[in-house]
From Swiss-Prot:
Residues binding ATP: 16-23, 42, 134
Origin organism lineage: Bacteria, Pseudomonadati, Pseudomonadota, Alphaproteobacteria, Caulobacterales
EC number, as in UniProt: 2.8.1.13
Protein name, as recorded: tRNA-specific 2-thiouridylase MnmA
Catalysis: reaction(s): S-sulfanyl-L-cysteinyl-[protein] + uridine(34) in tRNA + AH2 + ATP = 2-thiouridine(34) in tRNA + L-cysteinyl-[protein] + A + AMP + diphosphate + H(+)
Native organism: Caulobacter vibrioides (strain ATCC 19089 / CIP 103742 / CB 15)
Record function comment: Catalyzes the 2-thiolation of uridine at the wobble position (U34) of tRNA, leading to the formation of s(2)U34.
GO BP terms in the entry: tRNA wobble position uridine thiolation
Amino acid sequence: MRAAVGLPEGARIVAAMSGGVDSTVTAALLARAGYDVVGVTLQLYDHGAAISRKGACCAGQDILDARMAAERIGIPHYVLDYESRFREQVIEDFADAYLRGETPIPCVRCNQTVKFRDLLDVARDLGAEAMATGHYVQRAMPGNGGNRPELRRAADPAKDQSYFLFATTREQLDFLRFPLGGMDKPTVRAVAAGLGLSIADKPDSQDICFVPEGKYTTVIDRIRPQGAEAGDVVHLDGRVLGRHEGVTRYTIGQRRGLNIAVGDPLFVVKINADKRQVIVGPREALLTASLTLKEGSWLGAQDSLEAAAEDGQRVLARVRSTREPVPGRLAMIDGALSVVFDGAEEGVAPGQACVLYDPADPDRVLGGGFIAGTTRQMDLNAA
C-alpha cells in the first residue's frame, strides 16, 4: 500500500506525529512512497497522569513512541514545546466555555489554532510542500474540473473525523494531506504490524487528551475554581427543585446527575451561567427549530458562509459528532447567521459545532460554525 498525495516523489512533507498508530502509519506510508518526510511532534501538556495513561496524546510516553517510530521508519524527528500555547488557546478556552454554560469541543479548537495554524507555519519554515496528519477524512479534487480541493468524509463512517475539521480553511486544505482517509482502522493496524511498528496495537487516543480519566471537571476546577460554585436547579415553571455543585457539571440534554426527586423525567434544557441556574424541563423542551452560528467557516461555492446564507443554501446539518446530518437551510435572521431545520433537532448545545454537508453530495463538507444560540419549539424565555 502506498500513499498518493498528489506531489512528486522526493517532495518534502511534514508528518504530524502524536505517537499513535494513525499518525505513525501516515509517516511510514509517505516515506515508503519516496517522499522526504520530516516527523514533528508537539508537546502540548504534561501532567503526571499522562505519562503512562492509556489513550493520552502528545505528552509523556507518546512523545517517546513518536521518536522511536521515526527511528524505525528512518526519518528525522523534532519535538516542539507548545505547552503554554496549548494551555492558553485550548485548555483555558475549554474551561471558560463551560463557565459560560457552553459545551466546548477542544479538539476543534486545537485543530484551529495549534495544529492547523502554528504547525502549518512550522512545516512551511522547514521547506515542506505539504503537511500530513493521521485524521480520517478525505481531501479530493472536485469532479467538475475545479482547481480547489474539497474536504470529504472518510471512507470508513465509523472513523470519520470531518465533524472535528469543519473549520479548515481553503488555504489550509491546499497544504494538508490525509493519507488515511480512504482506509479503515483494521487496515491501518495491519499496515503498522507489517512494518514492524511497536505501536500497532496501541489504544486509540481519547477525545479530550488533556483530561485525566475522562473527568473534565477536574481540569476546570483546577484552573477556574469558580465553576464549582453551587446554584439552583430550576424547573421551567419557576419551581426550585434542588441545588447543583456548579454549572460546569451540566450540558444541554443531560438527565443523569441532577439529584432531584420528581415523578416525570426531566432534562437540562438551559444553563443560565450568570445566575448559576440549571434549568430543567420535559424532553419536548429540547426540540430545536433553528440555531445561530459564530466563527463560521465555508468551503462551498459562495465566497463566504454569510453569502451562502443570503442565498438560502440548502444543507445537511450535523450538531453532534455522534449524530447523522439532518436537512435544513442557511438563513440570515435578524442579522444573525442561522441554520433552520426542516424538522426539529433535540438537545442542541451552545459551544458544540454545527457542521454543514452538501445535500447533493452528502460526503462533502461545506463548512460550519460553533453554535451560539438556539430557538426552541417550546418557549424558554420565561426561564
